[in-house]
Amino acid sequence: MLSKILNFFNKNYTKKGEINMSCNGCSSCNSMFCFQCEQTAWGKGCTKFGVCGKDPRVAALQDLLVYELKGIGFYGEKLIEKDIEIEDRIDKFVMDGIFSTLTNVNFDEDRFVELLKEAEEIKKELKGKIAQCNCNAPEEALYELPEDKESMLKDAKRAGIMYNAALNEDVRSLREMLIYGLKGMGAYAHHAYVLGYSSKEVNKFFYKALAAAANNSLTVDDLFNLNMELGQANFKCMEILDKANTESYGNPTPTEVLVTKKKGPFIVVSGHDLKDLKQLLEQTEGKGINIYTHGEMLPCHAYPELKKYKHLAGNYGGAWQDQQKEFDKIPGAVLMTTNCIQKPKDSYKDRIFTSGVVGWPDVAYIQEVNGKKDFTPVINKALELGGWKEDELEKKILVGFGHNATLSYADKIIDAVKQGQIKHFFLIGGCDGAKPGRNYYTEFAQKTPKDTVILTLACGKYRFNKLDFGTIGELPRLLDVGQCNDAYSAVKIALALADAFECGVNDLPLTLILSWYEQKAVCILLTLLSLGIKNIH
């Protein structure tokens, strides 16, 4: 297993002789190095400009923020060892800070400068709580952040992935795997936190893992074990997020969702943030504005406390990578609540808004004040633009098969398996992406035999979720489990079926066909591996 994981990363970055090792995101030249996502240049790493739209300056500031977070991790771990409590606001900063560096989240230099300054203050605060530290603090803990942005950019080369040319490649790969897993888990922890849910166990692991990423004494085996530990921590984190979502908005139930346009003003909501959607629905009720989900917000239609709003009209478009085409000259407003944002085209830059950790230079941002967001600018823009002029012929798809809904069919599923009506289960899902060849997932789904069931989740579902797969008895052949974090639901379903058949998960007639794009997929992969789940393709 270890060799496969190392190969996963080693094959995705440029070898030492192929890039300028001394320059990583500094301000004096057009250079960077980032290999955290699937679409990196030539499959090795972005060295001039990010395929995602990230420029070298933003890349450098992100690297430096991760560097600062490693320093915070060092002092945080020391405090935890001494049973000294770390305040919730610092836990939140750590998860939000690491989340902000995830692919397609934030591209705003000034926001990163603010985060860096806050990180430096927190690092000093934590250091000040340790009376004596008879230990060798890493450079990340001792580093002092300069005041101005240009100096930060000059310093950022020390934070670059490839800065230490002598570092063992396997150690580098496992460190980066750990950091990318944290970025994904940071997203899930953030979404749970804004709903009032968190786990001290998960929060403590952020400090432990960040400190480990700066610890030069750790071996390949040490780092491998930490990656598996991260997988377990992320499973707990996804469990907390599932609880947050279901206790706040109810258990998802099978629901038909309109995927065609309705006449009138509208707002498209993209990302993953259920709380933002709830607040927007409250603020638009009775105003004649339709609300459409986009991308990973599609599963929101299945939550009782969200779908009770009649103006939650439907789902618009497909996965994240099509947004520049789908939002082009759109006669409505767009709200980006989390990743994935792409560079807005001029044709809709005046009507797209960001919130939470999302940022793009010169794009309107909706601030949160005392836990509330005022979406008046978004609402006014939607009314000003007027919306679509006529209805389209209706088409609907089915969502809402989280673990609670799917397991309500457990007896029927078990009987169908025993009677030979269901021969196999395929989980086809994960992050979608723009690279050619992803029609593989469409073709795979189409070729699955009619006596098999397809479970799907995350935005990879858009490759086939508008196709008709029919039914097996009373059960649809295609079951939409939810967002990427609902991998937790998929695991719960698999574990429940394994219990029912008195076998292990790997003995089930189950195959996982996964796609990846960014770091949430990395932490989910680590979770699956840490649970010992096999048959992953």
Identify the role of each PLM range.
Residues K4-N20:
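Short, Lys/Arg-enriched N-terminal segments with co-localized hydrophobic residues
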Residues S22-A41, C46, K54-V58, Q62, ...:
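Anaerobic metallocofactor- and corrinoid-dependent redox/one-carbon enzyme cores
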Residues S22-N251, T255-G264, V268, G288, ...:
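Long, compositionally biased, glycine/small-hydrophobic-enriched stretches that function as flexible linkers
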